[in-house]
A protein has these predicted regions:
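Alpha-helical transmembrane segments and their immediate juxtamembrane cytosolic regions
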Residues: 1-234
Length: 234
């Protein structure tokens, strides 16, 4: 029987709550025209990148703990493409062409293809270099100009004229994912502290085990509730 690291589930549950909270604020500010100056502040952007970055690392760890990354990658990428279709039809002004699910799906497929090669790299070296590369490349989108108009380059992280309401390009985020993949080998070996096996808040752990379905459903539900609310108060 595989060991379940409940603390990872709990951290993932906290992050998905923050994702939902962020999208509530996004809807209020960007769709319903609310005036929330703090939403566009540097502090808010850094906070968002912080909890999303934790999700990236956790996703990489999960890839080290399963052999079904090809199947998971295809399923996750399909979820991203579904979001593209739904936003194109229902909310073309908020079209998502390469969001977080597209990113996760691509990374899982890349990990499935390259995991044997990655396993030859020592954990500490791989994690350290991955974190370093994330910080070195995190402003790539703004630093490089004159890139050809290519969706592939846009997905990689270059400014090409394409746009996406939710945008998590391969570079720099893949390096946090890879850092998690390296750290995940410690979990796979069972060499992490026992605290990771504890389940102090089962409700949060449950949320963390169902992040995909929550992510797919939360925005339609949140948006629908807001439309109903604002129609009633008017």
């Amino acid at each position: 029987m595989k060991q379940r690291y409940h603390l990872l589930d709990m951290l993932r549950g906290i992050c998905i709550i923050l994702v939902v909270w962020y999208h509530v604020l996004y809807n209020l500010s960007e769709i319903f025209g609310g005036e929330y100056a703090f939403f566009r502040s540097v502090g808010m952007n850094n906070f968002r990148d912080g909890f999303v970055g934790v999700l990236m690392v956790l996703a990489g760890i999960s890839c080290s703990l399963t052999r079904s990354n090809l199947r998971r990658g295809v399923r996750t990428l399909a979820g991203g493409l579904l979001i593209t279709v739904v936003t194109a039809v229902a909310m073309p002004g908020q079209l998502i062409t390469f969001g977080i699910l597209h990113f996760f799906g691509c990374c899982m497929l890349l990990y499935a293809a390259a995991h044997r090669l990655l396993e030859k790299v020592p954990v500490a070296l791989g994690a350290a270099v991955s974190f370093l590369l994330y910080f070195v490349t995190r402003n790539l989108y703004y630093a490089v100009t004159g890139v050809p108009h290519s969706f592939l380059l846009f997905a990689l992280g270059f400014r090409t004229g394409h746009s996406s309401a939710d945008y998590y390009p391969i570079i720099p985020w893949v390096f946090l994912f890879l850092a998690g993949g390296f750290l995940g080998r410690l979990f796979a070996r069972g060499t992490v502290p026992d605290v990771f096996k504890q389940d102090p808040v089962p409700a949060l752990s449950w949320l963390g085990r169902h992040t995909m379905i929550i992510y797919l459903l939360h925005q339609p539900v949140v948006y629908g509730v807001m439309v109903l609310w604002f129609s009633l108060i008017k």
